[in-house]
Amino acid sequence: MRMLKHHKTNSSCNRNISAFDAISKSQEIVYSPMIFQTVYVLVNHNILKFIEDCKNGIAFNDLIKKTDFNDYALGLLLDVAVSASIIYLDDNGLYHLSKIGYFLQNDRMTRISLDFVKHVCYRGLDSLEDSLLTLEPCGLKDFNKSWQTIYPHLSELPTNAQQAWFAWDHFYSQTSFLNAIKIIDSSIKPRMVYDIGGNTGDFARTYLQYNHNIKVKILDLPSQIRLSKENFKDNNYNGRIDFEEIDILTHSFTEKCSADVIWLSQFLDCFAKEHIAMILKNLNDFMRDDTVLCILEPIADRQKFDAARLSINCGSLYFNTIANGYSKFLSTKELE
């Protein structure tokens, strides 16, 4: 696969910040958990939407009639929202949605991340310190004390957590699938693709719809293969989709490789460095000389925007505290 242009991070961007701005930012950081929970309630109870729908602003007494809260509770939410620049008050005492509030309410990426942090990560992140010290996903116990990693149990998560997990996982990969497929199809022209760690089969489906001659095999844990098969039960694309249950850490590829392309999308970030080295060696031994290994990963130091770098780096805390205890989103240097 082609490597994206490397956008260097600007590590000195905040070195010249004033003391006043620095302490203000510090206060925002330490109170950010409270702001986050406030935002979730405002979104979940449609309060931001009610304010947005009133183009000329809305008075407190009119807004309270639309909510489930009394004047005390609503006042708390609105006070924080104003202080955090999510909404603002005009000179007539009417509430309006700010530009920040607009994106919190309407931006799909932001809403997906909000639900993921709330339903998958938030409670578990209280165990971050223990997870970092032990290299175990101590926050996972909030779902089930006996689980060792999250992956075999995705189908067992509470509904809101399961939906949030898959929405988050799919959003940051699905947006790249078609572009990646076009590159693969035009430059490699494969006939058979192995999608290792294929999850629910979205990459496979996208490729099968794009190229009506391609064949795809999804290889994943048994729990994930069950989900994939369920998603293809109404359309097997004339037999062009196949499935195989494997645990990549213990699987021995003894059969002859029929893959022209082996596809790993947001897969290596689920493993420790020593596991990654072992996986890649095993795949290299399995591949034909003309098989091409294609890897798609979010890389923090290749991002153009600060918010993207922050999102990816914070996502690595999920891997430590919730997913497995030992993996992370990889840097350019680590991949090389």
Predicted features and spans:
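Conserved Class I S-adenosyl-L-methionine-dependent methyltransferase catalytic core
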Residues: 13-53, 66, 72-191
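Alpha-helical subdomain
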Residues: 2-91, 192-336
